[in-house]
């Protein structure tokens, strides 16, 4: 969010991109894309590299199944539409990173008739569950489609109290069609035995010249000096009592709060001084203890 806001503030189009779940390992990840030279390129947010399209997640991204971003307004572009609201449109940008295939799921009832308006969940195996990364509705032809990376994806379809499942296979690099039959009742348990294969590791080209690497090292050194100059203003055990300027039975606890507050120490000191002036320092300290370390220093 910070990097996107900073780039937009100086006129560079930027957006957050994320994979809802990795297909090859647990968890997810988010990063930043910028619009340069007529195309979107990525960077690792607050992880500066010498060039665009270089980040620690280049190989993981090559194994992704889905990548999403939000576009303000009533967007109408070539990407898959994941979700549309009055304020934004969520789209699938996996094609910017890897070779994709189009998965077409047709939903039928137990008698073989197509089902319109059925929910179709495209699921990625992650953290021991089939996570519904995208849920779409079938159209008038009983179909829902989605572009993904070349990996296995579990499909769950449901409508009118019935459901069915299927598997999109990794060995099909071309468009993949799957028919899911709603042949189970919502109250009915189902046992399945499946193997889930993530996309194979690929390569997202990332190269930087020696000059670019050297220039980036100089920038990092300069940025480190700015950060260290700022952190040197934080309160520590040596100057805490002097900065606090209060002689009370709660001084030790108050000093600890100043140290934990890091760059926010002035605001926390002001709060404690006002509390002390009103004979409420003990209560004020108890309230500060309820805050997480992150909250007190933000």
Regions found by a protein language model. Give the residues of each.
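Short Pro-Gly-centered beta-turn/loop motif in secreted/extracellular proteins
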Residues: 37, 140-162, 169-174, 265, ...
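Hydrophobic beta-strand segments
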Residues: 118-125
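Extracellular beta-sheet/turn segments enriched in Thr/Pro/Gly and aliphatic residues
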Residues: 82-96, 170-208
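Compositionally biased low-complexity segments at domain edges in trafficked proteins
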Residues: 183-245, 249
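Short, acidic Ser/Thr/Gly-rich low-complexity loop/linker segments typical of extracellular
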Residues: 126-148
